[in-house]
Structure formats: structure tokens, C-alpha cells
A protein has these predicted regions:
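Amphipathic, non-membrane alpha-helical segments in soluble helical-bundle scaffolds
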Residues: 18, 269, 273, 400, ...
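A glycine-rich phosphate-binding loop feature that marks nucleotide/adenosyl-phosphate handling sites
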Residues: 80-83, 378-383, 421, 431-438, ...
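Intrinsically disordered or highly flexible coil/loop and linker segments, enriched in small
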Residues: 37, 71, 163-164, 285, ...
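Structured secondary-structure scaffolds
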Residues: 56, 127-483, 530
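Basic, alpha-helical terminal appendages of large translation-related enzymes
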Residues: 74-79, 83, 92-115, 121, ...
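A non-catalytic, amphipathic alpha-helix used as a structural packing/dimerization or gating element
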Residues: 19-30, 60, 465, 469-472, ...
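N-terminal, positively charged nucleic-acid-binding surface of large information/translation enzymes
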Residues: 1-201
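Long, amphipathic alpha-helical stalk/connector segments used for oligomerization, subunit docking
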Residues: 432, 452-453, 462-467, 473-528
Length: 645
């Protein structure tokens, strides 16, 4: 909303907010296509084909929560800009976070950019982004989910989560921080003022400061008593900061452009706040995909058919991520979300743990629909040139499409997956954008890192694996069996040679597949890529050693040795290509094309432990007779960007 407002006011943008969102969505879809990223649906909750289905899901969930007695009306305070004559939402207010110990650079109406939640009246030094004035606080009615009622459930759930090897410790530890008692932290210099009003406070206990601590702690039975204490302390001139604790989770707001909400408890003419509707948006997208399947199959009964009737068409000029060609095994969304064998995975940044691990978990429990709780993979922050990446900083990171002017999408995919954001914040520092001065030329002019040939590009760290090692192994296999005029070697028949791979090769392939799967099970993509790196380099060396040894022989021993080297190399190439497929799909699918095998069969993990002979037999062919596609001279499966030559 805020970026749209600024565009209209400062640049004369004359289109509707729906058109603005649609244009942004189209650009993002084009970027996903440029990076070879596909999905069942890339949607927007306010855009067709999902918009009307999402409205229906929103109404169903809010009505259900009300039936369960877990949402109700609360009158709370909201910022109001008297000069602009309007209520302020979200990022239209900026100030400092009131949460104890928070180091956020920016805080907004009721949350900071590190994900901390608080009441608007707690925001320190609020300022309207519309006029620069200090806004007023005026009462408004909204619906709130009773999140504190699920404190005991959340404690038990979080303790179990801490034992789950798939869930990173940053998730459970961050969740634990929100499950503490409702507390206020008051600096010692306000102790006299606090003592003067303490008898007016609701029930509480005081924890005296230990050692050299500069503040003491006041603990309340619940958030209600803590909130009641705010006015007493403020009137007494006592400044304070809040500790993290569960508080009612706001469901609605008064923003004009949003998901409509049915009237509940007399609250009407409101829309759903963006965060809660983002929690159930994946359910809406699931239902949209299944509605699309139902429509294509001519299904006329069931929820999917009803959703199909709601489903609209995307804007004619919008860019779309291509839909998959397969049909899903069940059209009932509950089979995907509520069945005993359902698995839900969500990939988020660490600053969104509160929403997707605290609020969502409690809400799913409250609905009573047997919704599967998500397995959340939370990453640390991606830095840019060593600093927090932000579009509003002095050095904002380049848009993803701009990077393709300097790097291939395969190089970027491999590099980003290698960064290890599952363990710590890591800097993305592409040399092409590095403007640091690293020296002077012979004429005394300053040389920037981006132009300095001595500076190694961190973003190309993984590129050598692709353009060097992986290319070399693939070319060696296909050129090794290519028909060659004047060469009567039995393995030069254009087919993958039959025979069992050596024990060393079989063992290495099995260990690589298992290690890769274990890393991916824990969402440790950097470790998965490291497994592939080690495996490819070892496979390339085995091929190099074996082919050189074979070339030193003559006659039948030479033919037998080279055939065995090729059997081993093709085994390793097929396994490596399957492992690397999700990392660098375009190059791997090109290798599959020259194997001349259906991609569904080639990339199926059902065949990962099969020998080459067994794999060929599964295609309905005899070992030694599967013909590969002839490889042109000097062919690259993985290429450098044209600017890198």
C-alpha cells in the first residue's frame, strides 16, 4: 500500500492498486521463469485464479474460529494522522521497537522489521510517513484470535519441535522466546517513580536487578494485566519496555484493499490483515490447483468443483509460471492438508517465525480440522556486500533479473544454494557489483573491485564445478562412445556399454545418494551441493586415471579397460545428474536429452540405486544397445556467461 501511495503521489501513477499488484506479480513470474523455477501455482491472494477461492477460504476459517470461541471483538488503539485525516496502517508509521533487547533499525505500527509484535501505543517515537507528524491514537474495533489461550499447547509443541532433526534450532529457540511470562523491563533510574505508583498496578511481582544490570523486571499473570499497567506507569512518568509474550493476534484491519471478512460480533466493513490471511493462503492455492484439475477433468461434484465455479481468469496480459501437465491424485484438499500421511513444508526467513510457527500453529490447533502442522525451514538473513540486504538501503541489492546481465541462472542457483543460510547470515557479494576501491592502475587512477582482475568473484565459486568438472565428465562419456571414422574399438558404437560398474564406483554412488538425501532431509542445501562437488570431482579423477591407463594398453586389454572406464563413468554421470537436477536443472536436462531417455524415468529416484544395465532394461532395451544422442564437437552442457569470456 505504501509503495503504491508513493508511486501515485510522487510519479503520477494512474492505475488501480489491483493493476499495480498484477504488474509486480507478472515481473516476479517472469523472474521465476528466467531462473528455471517452476511450481504447481504461482499465485496472489488478491489475483485470479485464486482470489475468489481465497475469499471463500478466509470466510470459512474466520467463521470456524468464531464457532470455536477463539476470535472476538477487541477495541484497541490505532494511529491516526489528523493532518492527513486518515487512519494509518502498517508501514505508514515508523518508530523504534519497544521490545526489550531489540536492535531493529525500523519499527512500524505494530511490528518491527525483525518480526517483533507489540501494541501500537508501545511504539517509541512514532511518526507518520504521510505527513511527518506525530500521529494520534484513536480506538477502533477489530477481530482478534485468542493466541494466549494456547500457551500450554505451544510449550508442549515447541518442546517436541526441538527434538525434530528437520527443524533448525533457530526455530524452536525463537518460539521459546515468545512463550515467556508477560513482563515489563524498567530502568533503575525510574525506580522511585515506579515505587510511587506500584500500589495502583494489577497483580504483579518484581524481580530485582542482578549484578550490574541497569533494569528490573515486573512480571504479570497475563498480557491483560500487563496492558492495564501501561497507563498507570505512563501517568507516573515511568518508561518501560515489553518482553516477548503471547498476545491476542489481530485478524482484521481497516485497509480498503484487502480480503473481505464476514461480520462477526458486530465488527463489519473490515478486511483481513495481511499476516493472518497469508497463513491460510497456501490452503487457498492448494484448492485453486485442485479446482483447475477438476475443471480440466469435467468434475461436477465436491469442493474442487465448487471452487472451480469461483475460479476466475488471470489478466490477459499477465505473465504466468507454466502450470504442470500432470493431474493430482486427489481433488480433495483435505487429503493434502488433513490426512495422517500429509506433509507440509514451509520455507521462510527467520524474521517470520512468529507468524508461521507461533500464530499459525495455535490457529491450526484452534480450528479443530486436524490440519497438519508445518515443518518449517527457516533461514538466516542474506546480507549484501556484508550488510543487511534492504531495498531502502544506500546500496540495495540488484534485482534478480539484473544479475543475469553478468551471470547465468545456473551459476546463481548453485551459488545461492551453497551459502549455508541454514546456519548463519551470509553475504552475497557478486564482484560485478562490488564498487570498493582495491588499488590504482599504472596511471594512478582508482580501480574498483568489479574491474580488478586480481579480485576473485565469490559468486563464481561454484561455477568451475559446472563449466569444468561436470562438463568434462559428461563430454567424456558421450565422446567416448561416439562412432569415429577409422576407429573400430567395440565401445565406439554410439551406445552405453553393458557391464557392471566397479565396486568402488558402486559404493561411491550409493554413499553420495544417501549423503545427498540426508542433507536434503535437513534442508541443508549447502551440504547437499558439497556432496555433489566431492562426488563429481572424484568421479572425474577416476575417469581420468582409468582412461589414461587404458590408453597405455593395446589390443583387447585396451578395449576391455576403456569399456570398463566408460561403464563406470556413465554410472557416475547418471547419478550425478540426478543429484544435481534440482540445483542446475537446465544443464542436467540437457545431459538427459543426450542420454536419449524420458526425463520422468531418468530423474526418478526409484532408479537411483539401479545399475546402468538394470536402468536400460527398465526402458525395455537390452544392456549395451541403448543408443545415446550424438554430441556435437566442443559442446558445453554448462556455459559461462558471455561477459566472463
Amino acid at each position: 500500500m505504501e509503495s503504491y501511495r508513493k508511486l501515485k503521489e510522487n510519479e503520477g501513477y494512474d492505475k488501480s492498486i489491483s493493476e499495480y499488484v498484477e504488474s509486480n506479480h507478472s515481473r516476479q513470474a517472469a523472474t521465476l521463469n528466467n531462473y528455471n523455477i517452476s511450481c504447481d501455482i504461482y499465485g496472489g491472494s488478491g489475483l485470479e485464479p485464486a482470489a475468489q477461492i481465497h475469499n471463500e477460504v478466509t470466510a470459512e476459517i474466520i467463521k470456524r474460529l468464531h464457532e470455536q470461541g477463539t476470535i472476538s471483538k477487541r477495541s484497541t488503539l490505532q494511529f491516526y494522522d489528523a493532518k492527513a485525516g486518515t487512519f494509518l496502517n502498517g508501514r505508514q508509521v515508523i518508530g523504534r521497537c519497544p521490545i526489550q533487547g531489540c536492535k531493529s533499525e525500523k519499527a512500524y505500527a505494530d511490528e518491527c522489521d525483525l518480526g517483533h509484535q507489540f501494541e501500537p501505543e508501545e511504539l517509541i517515537a512514532p511518526k507518520s510517513q504521510l505527513t511527518g507528524e506525530v500521529p494520534e491514537l484513536r480506538p477502533v474495533d477489530n477481530l482478534y484470535f485468542d493466541l494466549p489461550a494456547y500457551l500450554d499447547f505451544m510449550k508442549t509443541y515447541t518442546a517436541k519441535l526441538a527434538q525434530n532433526p528437520q527443524v533448525r534450532s533457530v526455530v524452536s529457540k525463537t518460539m521459546e522466546e515468545w512463550l515467556l511470562p508477560a513482563q515489563l523491563y524498567i530502568q533503575n533510574k525510574f525506580r522511585e517513580a515506579f515505587d510511587a505508583v506500584e500500589d495502583q498496578l494489577p497483580e504483579h511481582t518484581v524481580l530485582e536487578p542482578e549484578g550490574n544490570k541497569s533494569s528490573f523486571t515486573v512480571t504479570f499473570p497475563s498480557w491483560k494485566e500487563r496492558d492495564d499497567a501501561h497507563a498507570v506507569l505512563a501517568n507516573g512518568g515511568v518508561r518501560f519496555r515489553s518482553g516477548k509474550a503471547l498476545v491476542p493476534f489481530r485478524i482484521t484491519g481497516n485497509i480498503d484493499w484487502g480480503v473481505p471478512v464476514p461480520e462477526v460480533d458486530g465488527v463489519s466493513d473490515v478486511t483481513c490483515w495481511c499476516w493472518p490471511e497469508s497463513l491460510w493462503a497456501p490452503i487457498s492455492y492448494t484448492r485453486t490447483v485442485l479446482a483447475r484439475d477438476a475443471k480440466a477433468a469435467g468434475v461436477t461434484e465436491g469442493v474442487a468443483a465448487q471452487d472451480a465455479a469461483l475460479m476466475g481468469e488471470p489478466a490477459a496480459d499477465s505473465t504466468q509460471v507454466p502450470a504442470p501437465t500432470y493431474q493430482h491424485s486427489s481433488l480433495d484438499w483435505r487429503d493434502w492438508w488433513c490426512s495422517d500421511d500429509a506433509q507440509i513444508y514451509q520455507f521462510i526467513g527467520q524474521d517470520n517465525i512468529y507468524f508461521y510457527c507461533i500464530a499459525q500453529t495455535a490457529m491450526w490447533e484452534a480450528l479443530g480440522w486436524n490440519l497438519t502442522q508445518s515443518t518449517v525451514s527457516a533461514c538466516y538473513h542474506l546480507l549484501y556486500m556484508g550488510k543487511k540486504a534492504s531495498s531502502s538501503s544506500q546500496t540495495p541489492p540488484p534485482p534478480a533479473d539484473d544479475l543475469l546481465n553478468h551471470y547465468t541462472c545456473e551459476q546463481m542457483r548453485a551459488h545461492w544454494l551453497s551459502l549455508g543460510l541454514s546456519e548463519k547470515p551470509v553475504s552475497f557479494s557478486p564482484k560485478a557489483y562490488d564498487t570498493r576501491v582495491t588499488g590504482k592502475d599504472k596511471d594512478g587512477n582508482e580501480v574498483r573491485a568489479c574491474d580488478d582482475k586480481r579480485v576473485i568473484d565469490p559468486a563464481l565459486k561454484e561455477s568451475a564445478l559446472l563449466t569444468g568438472v561436470f562438463n568434462r565428465l559428461a563430454r567424456s562419456c558421450f565422446y567416448g562412445v561416439a562412432v569415429k571414422e577409422g576407429d573400430e574399438s567395440p565401445y565406439r558404437n554410439g551406445c552405453i556399454p553393458a557391464g557392471a560398474a566397479s565396486d568402488t564406483v558402486v559404493e561411491a554412488a550409493q554413499q553420495a545418494a544417501l549423503a545427498f538425501e540426508q542433507a536434503m532431509y535437513k534442508f541443508e542445501t549447502h551440504r547437499a551441493l558439497a556432496v555433489c562437488d566431492d562426488y563429481l570431482r572424484a568421479a572425474n579423477k577416476r575417469w581420468s586415471d582409468a582412461s589414461k591407463a587404458a590408453n597405455k594398453l593395446e589390443g583387447e586389454p585396451a578395449n576391455a579397460a576403456m569399456t570398463q572406464a566408460l561403464v563406470d563413468a556413465f554410472t557416475e554421470l547418471r547419478v550425478a545428474t540426478v543429484l544435481m537436477h534440482g540445483i542446475v536443472p537446465a544443464g542436467c536436462e540437457l545431459i538427459c536429452e543426450y542420454f536419449d531417455v524420458d526425463p520422468v524415468a531418468f530423474f526418478s529416484w526409484d532408479n537411483i540405486f539401479a545399475s546402468t544395465d538394470e536402468f536400460v532394461e527398465s526402458l525395455g532395451e537390452k544392456p549395451g544397445e541403448h543408443r545415446v544422442k550424438p554430441l556435437p564437437p566442443r559442446f558445453d552442457f554448462f556455459s559461462k556467461h558471455e561477459s566472463q569470456y
